[in-house]
Swiss-Prot record:
Gene Ontology cellular-component terms listed: plasma membrane
Biological classification of the source: Bacteria, Pseudomonadati, Bacteroidota, Flavobacteriia, Flavobacteriales
Protein name: CD-NTase-associated protein 13
Cystine residue pairs: none
Source organism of this protein record: Flavobacteriaceae sp. genome_bin_11
Purpose of the protein: Effector protein of a CBASS antivirus system. CBASS (cyclic oligonucleotide-based antiphage signaling system) provides immunity against bacteriophage. The CD-NTase protein synthesizes cyclic nucleotides in response to infection; these serve as specific second messenger signals. The signals activate a diverse range of effectors, leading to bacterial cell death and thus abortive phage infection. A type I-D(GG) CBASS system.
Alphabetical keyword list: Antiviral defense, Cell inner membrane, Cell membrane, Membrane, Nucleotide-binding, Transmembrane, Transmembrane helix
């Protein structure tokens, strides 16, 4: 089933054409059904099938295909966010958790920052978040993790009483969606581009974290990873 769904994602136009064809067929059958008695009388045609049942069956198919098409279109719209989430998890989060455990920590905690907008990931805002963490009596330091199968990465540690309380990361990979957002909004005819851009950014970020959370659950890491916003809820 997964292979079929993957194929449909790259050929969604087929679903669209089939749905359109079924709509046309359904419309024709409805007309025949409405004028069934006239057709029988004028053309002396005897219908051996239940036209009403056929219309109902085709209608169910159309609803199912339209729902599938809607899902495919949504996935196509947000596919860059999904791809980034997969890359971020496989190339950093999962190897980082693995390496930290191999270094001797039994139950490491990583808190991933969840912004509402890309601007929250600028260096100025990151410095502000770090200041807030310091005000919460955390001692901040950065360590370099040598990850197996991935490049080494720096990660922020939040320390209390000379012990590592948890790790903290800003997913700067989200900033690579800037150009995608600009492209999508520029290709739109909607005049309220700034408002639309803001909403689209929020949706992309939300989809990124939904996919990331899905991967976290699939790999049984819900006890190791949390999300927190600018109010630092979740630490």
């Amino acid at each position: 089933m997964e292979k079929i769904y993957t194929w449909l994602k790259t050929n969604s136009y087929i679903v669209h054409h089939v749905s359109t064809s079924l709509n046309i067929i359904s419309f024709i059958i409805v007309l025949i059904w409405i004028f069934e008695s006239t057709i029988k009388e004028k053309l002396n045609i005897i219908f051996t099938v239940n036209l009403e049942a056929i219309v109902v069956f085709i209608s169910i198919l159309i609803v199912g295909l339209n729902q599938l098409l809607q899902k495919l279109l949504i996935e196509a719209e947000y596919s860059p966010a999904f791809a980034l989430a997969v890359g971020y998890f496989k190339n950093f989060i999962f190897p980082a958790i693995t390496q930290i455990k191999e270094n001797g920590e039994v139950n490491p905690k990583i808190c991933i920052y969840k912004p509402k907008h890309f601007d929250e990931l600028t260096s100025t805002n990151i410095d502000m978040i770090k200041a807030e963490l310091t005000n919460k009596k955390y001692n901040l330091s950065e360590i370099n993790l040598s990850l197996k199968g991935a490049r080494a990465r720096d990660i922020l540690t939040l320390n209390k009483k000379s012990k590592i309380h948890s790790y903290f990361d800003f997913p700067n990979t989200l900033l690579s969606l800037y150009s995608y957002v600009d492209f999508k909004i520029a290709s739109s005819n909607n005049n309220s581009s700034e408002l639309k851009k803001k909403k689209f950014v929020e949706l992309l970020i939300e989809q990124f974290y939904l996919k990331l959370n899905e991967l976290i659950q699939e790999n049984n890491l819900t006890n190791n990873i949390t999300f927190c916003d600018k109010n630092l809820q979740g630490l």
